[in-house]
Design a protein with these regions (language model features):
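Catalytic active-site module of serine/aspartate enzymes centered on a nucleophile-bearing elbow/loop
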Residues: 230-256
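Conserved HGGG/HGGXW glycine-rich cap/lid loop of the alpha/beta-hydrolase fold
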Residues: 45-91
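Flexible "cap/lid" loop of the alpha/beta hydrolase fold
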Residues: 134-138, 146-174
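Active-site loop/oxyanion-hole signature of alpha/beta-hydrolase fold enzymes
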Residues: 77, 87-120
């Protein structure tokens, strides 16, 4: 009669059991894809990656989601579901004859609703920061948190004087530049209406005045301003590994 070899049996079955356990621990909700969505009468290209609480990334004027690829990847790996959107008429989207921040804010608001996102956090760089602030002013209670880098809420007096003088008087027929010369048109009172925790940043050598950054952050009830030492408008943001740790620390501090 053949004697059953328990030792050999368990040696052969243990790797199978361990493999099954490991598979059960994998986060099957992790996603990575790109798509285009129609909102507010325009098509928006976006890249999505991760699993967990939603974070929306908004690039600067004339840029694309690719500018934020590093922070996108780092946040996804840290446990967030990240959506990097190409703003209307920019990146992979068809160009448009004119642009307004309020339209872009509505675009992102409708994106949030279409995707069924519950109080997402938004990080916006430059124009993207303007859009994030404008969104929460227009649609209060939509966002769970705001972080901005190099944002401004109005034009005159928000930029370093040597840049502002030449920029605002420069003749142009470029629609995106025309928008920046005339918008945004938000106010300090608008900032006081923002209810979500907000981190308002600019670089020490930014085009945006440090005093303007402080004006925004200090007038949002749950806001804070931070000037990033040694950095310019986008050096700590555009495909830089420096931004994600700042955002993750902010999200942790506010319980997001």
């Amino acid at each position: 009669m053949h004697k059953f070899n328990y030792r050999s049996f368990f040696r052969s079955i243990i790797p199978v059991i361990l493999a099954a356990v490991m598979c059960s621990c994998v986060n099957h909700s992790y996603q990575s894809y790109t798509d285009t969505i129609k909102v507010n009468g325009v098509s928006l290209f976006y890249a999505a990656e991760g699993a967990g609480k939603p974070v929306i990334l908004l690039h600067g004027n004339g840029g694309s989601h690719n500018d934020l690829e590093t922070v996108h990847r780092q946040l996804a790996q840290a446990g967030y579901m990240v959506y990097a959107i190409d703003s209307r008429g920019q990146g992979a989207n068809p160009r448009l004859p004119e642009y307004h921040y309020k339209d872009m804010a509505t675009d992102v608001y409708e994106f949030i609703k279409a995707k069924g996102l519950e109080k997402p956090a938004v990080f916006g760089f430059s124009d993207g920061g303007n859009i994030a602030l404008q969104l929460e002013v227009m649609y209060p209670g939509t966002l769970g948190a705001i972080a901005t880098g190099g944002a401004n809420i109005f034009v005159h007096g928000s930029l370093v004087p040597e840049f502002e003088q030449g920029f605002l008087t420069q003749p142009t027929d470029e629609p995106l530049v025309i928008m920046m010369q005339n918008e945004p048109t938000m106010t300090v009172e608008d900032m006081k209406s923002i209810g979500c925790p907000s981190l308002i940043m600019s670089g020490e050598n930014d085009l945006i005045l440090a005093d303007h950054t402080r004006l925004i952050g200090e007038n949002i009830p749950s806001g804070e301003a931070r000037i990033i030492s040694g950095e310019d408008h986008g050096s700590y943001i555009c495909n830089s590994p420096k931004l994600a740790p700042i955002l993750i620390d902010f999200f942790n501090r506010i319980g997001y």
